[in-house]
């Protein structure tokens, strides 16, 4: 567990890059085990790779997604409802992993 400093999180890629990688990897592994691996991989590589984590305070994180995440997805057939459901669950998992990595859980 890493000691968390909200001010350092403003420059997260300088101060917390390994921890961010660990959280994203753990979230991917969970999603890959629970959902279609092609869809999980596509969301990871084509949507979440362009996402931005933010610390909201009180141990809470928020993931800002790129614009039009569904339009970024290619190479996998999925309807809009399924995509939104899996993406929402993936974001929840990622936020939870960030909380765990930084000792809020």
Regions found by a protein language model. Give the residues of each.
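Acidic, polar-rich N-terminal leader regions of halophilic archaeal proteins
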Residues: 1-105
């Amino acid at each position: 567990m890493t000691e968390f400093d909200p001010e350092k999180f403003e420059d997260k890629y300088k101060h917390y890059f390994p921890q961010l990688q660990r959280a994203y990897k753990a979230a991917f592994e969970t999603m890959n085990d629970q959902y279609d691996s092609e869809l999980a991989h596509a969301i990871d590589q084509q949507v979440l790779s362009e996402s931005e984590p933010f610390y909201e305070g009180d141990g809470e994180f928020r993931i800002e997604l790129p614009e039009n995440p569904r339009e970024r997805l290619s190479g996998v057939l999925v309807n809009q409802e399924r995509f939104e459901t899996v993406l929402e669950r993936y974001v929840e998992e990622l936020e939870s992993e960030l909380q765990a990595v930084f000792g809020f859980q």
